[in-house]
Structures are given as structure tokens and as C-alpha cells.
């Protein structure tokens, strides 16, 4: 049975979005293939010819590129980077990252809302990275966001679902794809997030810092698939107290001498 999701006018089957920020160009192709990802994020500084070797030469042509506005400190800078990305990559997808906190690398939600509103009006498929907050998520939705991308934990920390309860609120209240971005450190954490009902997972550091990058990419792929199967199957009830036997406790020995 088909189990896809839509962003803008495109449909995707893989729920694993791969970040490319920490790989060598030579390894990115292998990671994509093992992950079977259909969307790959790219920072514009690695995609602009002449700055350094172009990462785009290593990404298969059938992959949807998701440029990000990494380096933007406010809405104005994010909009400039997004427009440059459209010109260079010839696509409308853009991941909004507005970060002026250099210690914790937390997104500036309010500048993100401003950038989202401007870029959505210009026809971009806007995917905003944000700190999970219901009111901000509603504002992003109303501004024209195509999805909501809450962080699980600070960027690059690999600490897992620290914001789990807040992400669950977004799943329950926001009628847009919820894509968990940043902080997922293990395949099991990706599986748990998908079991909760998030649409997809974006991961980068957990894979890029593994000893065996292709194998870790594949592990994340299988974990995300398992989480989705569990979500669709509907998880069994949880007993707060006591126990419930899985086999009959009486009657088996009746009549046995």
C-alpha cells in the first residue's frame, strides 16, 4: 500500500531526509544510496561554484535538493540566501534557518516567521526550522509554511528527543507535516519519533560522525521504516499499574491427574 507524503506539489516515499553538512563530498553519494533518501539538504556555501568543490556534483540528479539558509542571522539575510538558492539550484524548496545564538545554536522563531511569510508569497516551498512552540507553529502555518521542522535537541548534540512532549503537541494540533530536525542521535530515537506520528526525520550529525557512515545511514532508514509501520499498526495499550497475562492463568490443569 502506498504510504507517501507531500511537500508543495511533490510526493515523497522516503521519510528520511538526509543532511549533507558534515560529510566529505566523496561520502555523501554513498550515504544517500544507503539511506535511500529522496531529499538532501545543502548549505549554499557548498553549492556555489568557485567557493570550493561543488557538492552538487556528488548528489544524484533524481534527488530533491533542499537548500538551507545556514548562516542567516535575521529574516532579511535568510530571504537573500533563499533567493540565491533559487537562482543557483533552480528549485523552490527552501529550509529556513535563522540563528543568531552562537552558543546553543537555537533558531530565532520570530525572525523565522518573518522570512517564511515573505518567501511563501514569492512561491517558495518553505520548510522552517524552529524551536517547538505551538503558537509559533500556528504563526508559521498561517504565514504559508509547507511543513514545520521542530528541533529534538540542539544542533549536532545527538542528545535525542529532549523536546518530545512539545513535538507531540505540534503533531496533535498542526495540520501540516511535522519533520523532526536536529538532535536525533540514534536510529532508535528516529524510530521513536516516527512512532509518535511525525511525518519524517532529518538527520545529519548522527550519521556523519559514525565510524561506518553507509551502515549508519542504512540503520536510520530501517529504524524510520519500523517506526512508521508501528505507527500505522497502532501501538498497544500501556498499563500504568499491574499486569495482564498473555496466556490463560486457569483451567489448563483441570482434569489432569
Swiss-Prot record:
GO terms for biological process: thiamine biosynthetic process; thiamine diphosphate biosynthetic process. GO terms for cellular component: 2-iminoacetate synthase complex; cytoplasm. The active site is at 95 (schiff-base intermediate with dxp). GO terms for molecular function: thiazole synthase activity. It catalyses: [ThiS sulfur-carrier protein]-C-terminal-Gly-aminoethanethioate + 2-iminoacetate + 1-deoxy-D-xylulose 5-phosphate = [ThiS sulfur-carrier protein]-C-terminal Gly-Gly + 2-[(2R,5Z)-2-carboxy-4-methylthiazol-5(2H)-ylidene]ethyl phosphate + 2 H2O + H(+). Gene3D superfamilies: Aldolase class I. It is an enzyme of class 2 (transferase). Its EC number is 2.8.1.10. InterPro entries: Aldolase_TIM (IPR013785), Thiazole_synthase_ThiG (IPR033983), ThiG (IPR008867). Pathway: Cofactor biosynthesis; thiamine diphosphate biosynthesis. Keywords: Cytoplasm, Schiff base, Thiamine biosynthesis, Transferase. 1-deoxy-D-xylulose 5-phosphate binds at residues 156, 182-183, 204-205. Transmembrane segments: none annotated. It is found in: Cytoplasm. Belongs to the ThiG family. Catalyzes the rearrangement of 1-deoxy-D-xylulose 5-phosphate (DXP) to produce the thiazole phosphate moiety of thiamine. Sulfur is provided by the thiocarboxylate moiety of the carrier protein ThiS. In vitro, sulfur can be provided by H(2)S. Homotetramer. Forms heterodimers with either ThiH or ThiS. This is Thiazole synthase. It comes from Fusobacterium nucleatum subsp. nucleatum (strain ATCC 25586 / DSM 15643 / BCRC 10681 / CIP 101130 / JCM 8532 / KCTC 2640 / LMG 13131 / VPI 4355).
Amino acid at each position: 500500500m502506498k504510504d507517501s507524503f507531500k511537500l508543495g506539489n511533490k510526493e515523497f516515499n522516503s521519510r528520511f531526509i538526509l543532511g549533507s553538512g558534515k560529510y566529505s563530498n566523496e561520502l555523501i553519494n554513498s550515504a544517500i544510496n544507503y539511506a535511500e533518501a529522496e531529499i538532501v539538504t545543502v548549505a549554499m556555501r557548498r553549492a556555489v561554484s568557485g567557493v570550493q568543490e561543488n557538492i552538487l556534483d556528488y548528489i544524484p540528479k533524481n534527488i530533491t535538493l533542499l537548500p538551507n539558509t545556514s548562516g542567516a542571522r535575521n529574516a532579511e539575510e535568510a530571504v537573500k540566501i533563499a533567493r540565491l538558492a533559487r537562482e543557483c539550484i533552480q528549485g523552490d524548496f527552501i529550509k529556513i534557518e535563522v540563528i543568531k545564538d552562537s552558543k546553543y545554536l537555537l533558531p530565532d522563531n520570530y525572525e523565522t516567521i518573518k522570512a517564511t511569510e515573505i518567501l511563501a508569497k514569492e512561491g517558495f516551498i518553505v520548510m522552517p526550522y524552529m524551536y517547538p512552540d505551538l503558537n509559533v507553529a500556528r504563526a508559521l502555518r498561517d504565514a504559508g509554511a509547507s511543513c514545520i521542522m521542530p528541533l529534538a535537541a540542539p544542533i549536532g548534540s545527538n542528545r535525542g528527543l529532549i523536546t518530545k512532549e512539545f513535538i507531540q503537541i505540534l503533531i496533535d494540533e498542526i495540520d501540516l507535516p511535522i519533520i523532526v530536525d536536529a538532535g536525533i542521535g540514534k536510529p532508535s530515537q528516529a524510530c521513536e519519533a516516527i512512532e509518535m506520528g511525525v511525518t519524517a526525520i532529518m538527520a545529519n550529525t548522527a550519521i556523519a560522525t559514525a565510524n561506518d557512515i553507509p551502515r549508519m545511514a542504512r540503520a536510520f532508514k530501517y529504524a524510520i521504516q519500523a517506526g512508521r509501520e508501528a505507527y500505522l499498526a497502532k501501538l498497544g495499550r500501556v498499563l500504568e499499574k499491574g499486569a495482564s497475562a498473555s496466556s490463560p492463568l486457569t483451567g489448563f490443569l483441570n482434569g489432569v491427574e
